[in-house]
Amino acid sequence: MRGRCRRLLALLALLMLLPAFAATAAERRLTSVGSDTLGELLQAWAQAYADGDATLRFQIRTPGSAAAPAALATGAADLGPMSRAMTAEEAADYQRRRGREPGRVRIAYDAVALFVHPDNPLRSLRLADVARIWAADEHCGGADAMRWSELGVGGALADQPLLRLGRNTASGTFEFFQQAALCGGGYRTDVVQFPGAGAIVAAVARTPNAIGYAGLGHANGLVRVLPLARGDEDAVLPDAATVIAGRYPLARPLYLYFNRADDGRPSPEVAAFLRFALSPRAQEIAARHGFVALPAADVSRESGQLQ
């Protein structure tokens, strides 16, 4: 009698576990490894995309754009968000491992903004001044700017040294800024590097003599964004109009890279998410996060890759 009871209890326990086993078996997962700049947007997209779908799970890691190519090539990621294009070396290494080129969809535009403390009286900068602040040599700008007075700042800040903040080498923003603002030259050795853009903005907010760069989506009321000029043009703030028109000097496209199947297309699960990323709803979310939504012509072109 006791043996039958034990067997019955064991059977009941097994039956209670079956729904959990079934749910686990049916669960689908998308893994994203890459850009810190795109981290919060990917989280928001994942939440919106997975609403009402209990079987879909997203895993989003943001070590930086440099991590995306290898994560895709090894199969550790389904999506590789990058705030810059893959380098020729990264693309060649990917093709060597996978036997084909990666897929890539442009998902939004961004601007790398220059941030100063609200009490800093500096009104604007020229691109050549940016090189004077961050570059290790003078081939792109002019003589190094060491104190704020050398950038035209007066008052209590004039004799203060510049505290230069920037991203670390794993960041796509680090590489984009190096090419677009420093003429491809090296960074000064006294640039304080951060793994995340949010930490740069937070440091500027509490340090009157600091200046940093990060994606525009990290702007907040605790810091001030500087207008920026190219050559003799008027300085402009980064916004949707100046980015799309090409007037803001540090504008850039943002990408989601993916693995292609033998037919050149992404997997059905990845393709469905990419179509969502190009949808009006997702583009509206991107705009709310400080990015610039794709124009209709861009959406049409990028969507063509998913047909």
Each predicted region: which residue ranges?
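Bacterial N-terminal signal peptides that target proteins for export
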Residues: 1-11
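Bacterial N-terminal signal peptides
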Residues: 9-20
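Flexible loop/hinge segments at secondary-structure junctions
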Residues: 25-307
